[in-house]
Design a protein with these regions (language model features):
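A structural microfeature
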Residues: 164-167, 228, 376
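Flexible glycine-rich active-site/ligand-binding loops centered on an Asp-His dyad
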Residues: 147-157, 167-188, 381-386
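Short regulatory "switch" loops immediately downstream of catalytic or recognition motifs
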Residues: 136-139, 251-255, 352, 385-386
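Residues in well-ordered beta-strands of folded domains
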Residues: 84, 116, 170-172, 230, ...
Length: 418
């Protein structure tokens, strides 16, 4: 079998005006998420695997027994488990005019997220989701020419129809050939490290601390205080493999192997782009394949934005301790995090307030690369226990979200009984 040494020029995919208009028509329409994530139930093992996939060894998440002695009375999941664990919701078929456009062949990446958490996910919980488009914005991007910005709402709830979290994911779609022609990042070089450089990184790892069982009370927090320093990196292909092992990255495109990959190519052919050997491979490999990343105008493979979201969440949960509650986190992915890059995460308290029974701490944090570039600025709000009650308050979702979750779970059960 001959193996070609070069690949054909990738097929050019551009936006269709009718797809853009269709997306605009669907803003505010909720739909059941009928495609499962890699895992469907938050078992002790899936919770542990997800936490470890981004480097988190918090016993609240990785030890099935540790949480029994805490206010949660059991093992709970780390904040972003929803990106790897969700069952398919059974739902009535959507009319063609209400189906979201696929934008096949168009490159997509996550530019930022805003997430609010309402209650813990426990071992044994099954998660479901519904969502919809919050807005549609067409613009000229400095990186890729014509681009489409789509904030997507994702509401996650459990088997009791209780809203667990609401997440708005800012996705950006770009035309691949335009990205290549602009070549904005051509001067960026891959990071290299001396033994001394690596020793400095290891010093930060060795000094990291987790608050754990030592309760951090709201009264003891001072505006201006630092949350400390965490390091992540240098980023390796191994990191991407391990992150996938936690469950992320398999929906909606379902990268797979063997006969399953053949079947997937029949389903979404434009998602497969020939590699240097002439073999169709997933466009998702931009996250681990330098050659493919360079072919679309990027200096090299880069991470998923959701990985850095997990890093930021790791930083916050380490600081707040077992008794705290991460109420909200909002991030922006302003620059790519390339293979070999190292990030230090820092943050400080910028405010304190009381809302009802919630004792809240507002935080600004960010991830800064070895180029001294802030690639992922973020804000967060943490609910901490006060000394009088001893408990961190949890927020309540809106009645509308509760109603939609109950309706969708009811229909899911009805269709399953047929």
């Amino acid at each position: 079998m001959a193996t070609p040494l070069t690949t054909d020029e990738p097929k050019i995919y551009t936006f269709k005006d009718e797809d853009i208009q269709k997306a605009r028509d669907l803003v505010g329409v909720y739909y059941a998420m009928t495609q499962r994530e890699q895992f469907t139930t938050a078992t002790p093992d899936t919770i542990r695997a997800f936490a470890r996939s981004y480097g988190d060894d918090n016993p609240m998440f990785v030890d099935a027994d540790y949480g029994r002695s805490t206010r949660w009375a059991g093992q709970i999941a780390p904040p972003f488990l929803n990106i790897g664990v969700a069952a398919a919701l059974r739902a009535d078929s959507m009319p063609r005019e209400k189906r979201q456009p696929s934008f096949r062949g168009i490159h997509v990446f996550v530019s930022g997220t805003t997430t609010k958490w309402y209650r813990p996910v426990y071992a044994g919980d099954t998660l479901y989701s519904f969502g919809g488009l919050a807005d549609v914005e067409l613009k000229e991007s400095e990186f890729a020419g014509r681009s489409l910005i789509l904030p997507r709402l994702k509401a996650t709830f459990n088997q009791r129809a209780e809203i667990v979290q609401l997440q708005t994911i800012l996705t950006i779609y770009t035309e691949r050939h335009e990205a290549k022609s602009r070549n904005k990042y051509r001067d960026i070089e891959a990071a290299t490290y001396s033994d001394e450089d690596l020793a400095k990184i290891d010093e930060i790892y060795a000094a990291e601390q987790r608050r754990g069982a030592q309760t951090r009370y709201w009264e003891d927090v001072e505006v201006g205080e630092s949350l400390g320093t965490m390091v992540k990196g240098p980023l390796l292909t191994t990191d991407m493999i391990v992150f996938h092992s936690g469950g992320y990255g398999f929906s909606p495109y379902t990268p797979c192997t063997g006969r399953l990959a053949y079947q997937n190519r029949q389903r979404i052919g434009p998602f497969y782009i020939k590699n240097e050997q002439g073999v169709p491979d997933v466009a998702q490999r931009v996250h681990w394949d330098d050659a493919y990343a360079k072919s679309i105008g990027i200096p090299g493979a880069y991470d998923y934005g959701m990985l850095r979201d997990c890093w930021l969440g790791h930083y916050l949960t380490d600081w707040m301790g077992d008794a705290g509650w991460l109420l909200e986190q909002s991030s922006q992915m302003r620059k790519f995090n390339y293979m070999g890059d190292t990030h230090t995460i820092t943050g400080e308290v910028v405010g304190k307030r009381v809302e009802g029974d919630l004792h809240l701490v507002d935080i600004e944090l960010r991830g800064t690369s070895q180029r001294d570039e802030v690639t992922c600025p973020a804000t967060a709000t943490v609910s901490l226990p006060d000394r009088e009650s001893g408990l961190a308050g949890l927020p309540k979702p809106s009645p509308e979200m509760d109603r939609v979750a109950a309706q969708m779970l009811k229909r899911h059960a009805e269709l399953g009984a047929k």
